[in-house]
């Protein structure tokens, strides 16, 4: 499959840009995820960039899984070593790996919205504050 075949001119320009960060600003449904997946596949297949030298981040777990599937489909193989995840999971992974280098307890927990609400309610209860 030709990685560039289904892309328009602007998308091709972003996909084939020199290796390094690329900023793509576009509205919903304009093909940003398509550009990101095609760029990852292009860099690996055409420029022999190693997967462990790249990272693709998005906002949802569903989108991250879809990106992985699309990249694998474009390349016709499973891509090992490529980091694809949400902003939160990717940053949490970096923190877990690098926590030894900063003054942070390595057993920290990242709270989601439900966890945060539960803690605030517990604190208010502990302070005898009526809602």
Name each model-derived stretch.
Residues 97-131:
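DNA-processing P-loop NTPase/helicase core
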